[in-house]
C-alpha cells in the first residue's frame, strides 16, 4: 500500500516518540489506525486485518521483527527473554493488507478465527502481494511486503527468542523497512499526537 502523495514524511530523530504505552492506549491507537486503513483498503480493492501475528505453542521468549532501525519487540511473553528493555522499538499494533479471493474489501475479521496452520492461505489471492505494517512506539510504520508463500503464515516475517536467549533457528531474517506510504505515516503521527 504505497501512497502516490508527493509529500515526504520526515523520519528523523525528532520523530522518536518512545514511551511506555498502556494496553488500553495501544488498542485505541490500533483501532483508529485500522478504521483509517479499512477505508484505504476498500478504495484500493484490498482487505486489511489487524491479525498481524498468530502462533501456536512456542517457547517462553519474545517475538520480534527485524527493522532497518533495530529489533522491534512484537510480543512480550513476560518472561524477560530478552525482555522489554532489550528492544529499541516496541510494537503498538499492526495490520496486514492483502487481496481477498472473494469479493471482499475493507476490514476483514476472518484471519482472527482461522486456524494457525492455515494462515492467510484460504483468504488471500496467491497471485497478489501481502503487506504487513507494524506501528512502532518510535512513531514510525515499518513495512514488509512479500508473496503469500513468504508471508502467508500468521508468524511470517517474525523471529522468536528461545528460552536460553538465542534466536530460534527458523526465525525470519526479513527486514521491515520504513514504509514509504506517506499517507499512512502522516495519519499514524496524527493518531500518536493525541497520546504524547
Residue ranges and their predicted role:
Residues 3-196:
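Mature, Sec-exported extracytoplasmic domains of Gram-positive
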Amino acid at each position: 500500500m504505497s501512497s502516490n502523495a508527493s509529500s515526504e514524511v520526515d523520519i528523523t530523530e525528532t520523530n522518536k516518540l518512545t514511551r511506555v504505552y498502556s494496553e488500553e492506549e495501544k488498542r485505541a491507537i490500533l483501532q483508529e489506525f485500522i478504521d483509517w486503513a479499512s477505508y484505504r483498503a476498500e478504495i484500493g480493492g484490498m482487505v486489511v486485518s489487524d491479525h498481524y501475528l498468530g502462533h501456536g505453542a512456542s517457547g517462553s521468549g519474545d517475538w520480534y521483527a527485524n527493522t532497518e532501525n533495530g529489533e522491534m519487540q512484537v510480543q512480550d511473553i513476560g518472561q524477560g527473554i530478552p525482555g522489554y528493555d532489550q528492544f529499541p522499538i516496541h510494537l503498538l499494533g499492526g495490520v496486514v493488507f492483502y487481496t481477498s479471493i472473494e469479493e471482499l474489501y475493507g476490514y476483514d475479521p476472518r484471519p482472527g478465527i482461522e486456524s494457525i496452520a492455515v494462515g492467510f492461505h484460504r483468504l488471500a489471492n496467491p497471485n497478489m502481494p501481502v503487506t504487513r505494517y507494524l506501528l512502532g512506539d518510535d512513531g514510525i510504520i515499518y513495512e514488509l511486503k512479500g508473496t503469500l508463500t513468504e508471508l502467508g503464515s500468521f508468524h511470517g516475517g517474525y523471529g522468536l527468542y528461545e528460552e536460553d536467549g538465542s534466536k530460534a533457528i527458523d526465525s525470519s531474517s526479513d527486514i521491515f523497512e520504513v514504509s514509504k506510504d506517506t499517507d499512512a505515516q502522516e495519519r499514524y503521527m496524527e493518531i500518536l499526537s493525541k497520546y504524547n
